Amino acid sequence: LVDLFTKDSFNTVEDYSNLDWPETTWNFACSTTETSTWADGGRKFGELMEKATGGKVKVNIYAADQLTNGNQSEGIQALMNGDPVQISMHSNLIYSAFDPRFNVVSLPFVYDSYDDADAKFDGEAGEKLKEILGEYGLHCMGIAENGFREITNSKHEIKSVDDMKNLKVRVAGSNLLMECYKRWGADATNMNWSETY
């Protein structure tokens, strides 16, 4: 079923209904909003899963980590526990709270382009991250990037590190990013993604 959600089979799916699936419902959680591509991906996964199992497996979508009151770290812990979350899409930044090795994905200035990042995570780096998730009893179906860490604000354009001085910014729950922004002179605050919109 890992191939169920790949680019090649995005709109078609093989029939696995002969595998005697128990009737069950899985909960899919993501930290982004209901209208995000992450939630859309969860809905598409649910559609394909239901089709592949002859309707025996249904998938409920819980955006903004609704099952854990918006707490992203608790969302991952719920996935590790298998209850109430069975499938999730979360950022490496949140996983870094459990294991600092996930910070490698967010190191500044490591990737030359989106193609470079994709090549790394489609290769050895991605396989290593999947191994680390396996250490926590999790199975990674795929790795996706969500863009580089662009800095957006309502005060002024940022062209150099000097423009960061005393700028109040929201930073995802990563000690690495908090330290980077502080060293760049920003007034960084940790905030869950679900609290930003």
What are the roles of these predicted feature ranges?
Residues 10, 25-43, 64-69:
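Extracytoplasmic "Venus flytrap"
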Residues 44, 52, 58-80:
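Extracytoplasmic small-molecule ligand-binding "clamshell" domains
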Residues 25, 56-60, 168:
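Residues at or immediately flanking beta-strands
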